[in-house]
């Protein structure tokens, strides 16, 4: 990639921002060496890695990556008989600690492997060494201190040292206390790593010992008393022994590190890369970046692109595309209107994407991969001092023309400026034609009207302009494709106070052709602005309609859910009523089985169950209230009709506080409330009695078989029928029955047997014999 372009577009500023977000020196080193790539697969992988890392940060926050240094040279030094110093061992421990933490950073859910496969694969490649980490942490305290726990021998040596030092101090303190007059100071100090005392020169001869030093004034000599010379010698020997033991420990740990060097090298490289990738992800979050589409067709489409180095709260987004129906874009408009920023935005965003950096554009933007990007952007401060403005630009253009490739992007700022306008415009058109005929993607900014006409008349060339608000005399920085811009020199001058006569005179000097062209531009601009405003209103209206539609859809969904809730609650209530009624029926049936006239009892029980079901159906449709019962007085022995089940009976208990009492209906006693009772006359009682006897007589002969066939039914249907069948069997007194369920898959047999095991009415379950159905049937014995 052209080095001048990288500097002009401030590519290094982007690298610096990413480098600062790296946690480790190795990560920073990768960021510092970053350059744009040209292979699509490499770029796609790098962008996707960054996008995955960004997703993880949003979900799990920043990863636990610590300081990582290059430990390879230190580890390889072990192979030459050396050892690793404590400082580097601590760094190796830090690398391994980071491996441990980052492998647990996101967990190992299927969702992570599906959404972030590349980052998860990198994390999986990390190798943990827990035993080595424990050894390092146990042995190394700091960069220059080894723990007593490193070995038993080291602990013993240091304990002996402490005792020896204490002995020396005791000896010297004894000497100090008995020779106070001879001492310069009553202290113990060190010279040449040996304990000495400061003695006045005048008393030097009164001390037996070795002189190690004297003061700068010559008044003090530092003497090692003979009484401690041997102790000092022993202390020195212990220190030497300590150093040897420390080196032995370091070599032992170093050998263990060397044994797993390949794993540590992988960990170092992967952690460094992860550090760099997550730094790119953090930067992407800062600039609200997205993951663009890529192509090698020379087509790019940036939607609401923002220059990443400008304040994102103030920068005005631009939407720009090139390489589809046109290859050359000519941008015109006033100075400071945003033309140069547009060029730099296009160039820098392209460089970022080709470097695997997510870009500040809206979703579904597309980036073209270029072999090279050439720029001629700058002002007089950036131009070589020895050349004129025009010469400096032209020298740069010559370099571009000589080095251009088919798959290049060229960005010209004020092409043809710095010389005679007529000649400059002609040169600019000729240069643009060179690139146009080679289908090289080119964007150029200019003030020349000739280039506007060139863009209007030449195929595959399009005009563009930066918008200027003449009312506020300020640029809006909005880019418009397809519309040439105006300089607005006359309007700006008038609003700034220039006399109208001067402005009118200037207009007269213009050729009629220039006037007509400017009028056309003004008309186009006005109409374009009106179209844009209409389009914006349509978009707002569409947005309002969409919001309204969404609101109504939500209301409909809410109503639907509420309806379903009401229905479900009603079903639950109905089911509860049914189950309660069924339980009451079962209790009645259990009482009836003790009666002598079993067939009559079954008739009454079935009739009661049917009446209960009838009552349930009625009570779920409307609330039953007996208004007349409130006015009548009921007492013990009264004949009444129970509303809802159409049965008659005799009151056999006094009502409680709630109005509940017992009514004798034939051989049954039924709970009822006075609200649901109606007093009846004697004639009605006689008719009812006859009716009940008639029912019993008609149903007494009903035939209950000793087997039931449940084949072809699902488990729920089979159990429902079986439950009713067992009730009937209990009433008529059958003790052994055969349940035919068939063989099939065995699921029906299994479901029925599970139900029977929980049924208290069943005394015993046994398989049918071979000639009785085998596995396709089950015999049960009832209590």
UniProtKB/Swiss-Prot annotation:
InterPro entries, A to Z: DNA_mismatch_repair_MutS_C, DNA_mismatch_repair_MutS_core, DNA_mismatch_repair_MutS_sf, MSSS, MutS, MutS2, P-loop_NTPase, Smr_dom
Binding site for ATP: 333-340
Claim: rRNA-binding is one of the keywords in the record: yes
GO molecular function, one term: endonuclease activity
Keywords: ATP-binding, DNA-binding, Endonuclease, Hydrolase, Nuclease, Nucleotide-binding, RNA-binding, rRNA-binding
SMART domains: MUTSac, MUTSd, SMR
Domain Smr: 708-783
Superkingdom field: Bacteria
Keyword RNA-binding on entry: yes
GO terms, biological process: mismatch repair; negative regulation of DNA recombination; rescue of stalled ribosome
Enzyme class: hydrolase
One Pfam short name: MSSS
Enzyme nomenclature, EC number: 3.1.-.-, 3.6.4.-
Subunit structure as annotated in this protein's UniProt entry: Homodimer. Binds to stalled ribosomes, contacting rRNA.
Biological function: Endonuclease that is involved in the suppression of homologous recombination and thus may have a key role in the control of bacterial genetic diversity. Acts as a ribosome collision sensor, splitting the ribosome into its 2 subunits. Detects stalled/collided 70S ribosomes which it binds and splits by an ATP-hydrolysis driven conformational change. Acts upstream of the ribosome quality control system (RQC), a ribosome-associated complex that mediates the extraction of incompletely synthesized nascent chains from stalled ribosomes and their subsequent degradation. Probably generates substrates for RQC.
Family: Belongs to the DNA mismatch repair MutS family. MutS2 subfamily.
Protein name as it appears in the record: Endonuclease MutS2
Phylogenetic classification of the source organism: Bacteria, Bacillati, Bacillota, Tissierellia, Tissierellales
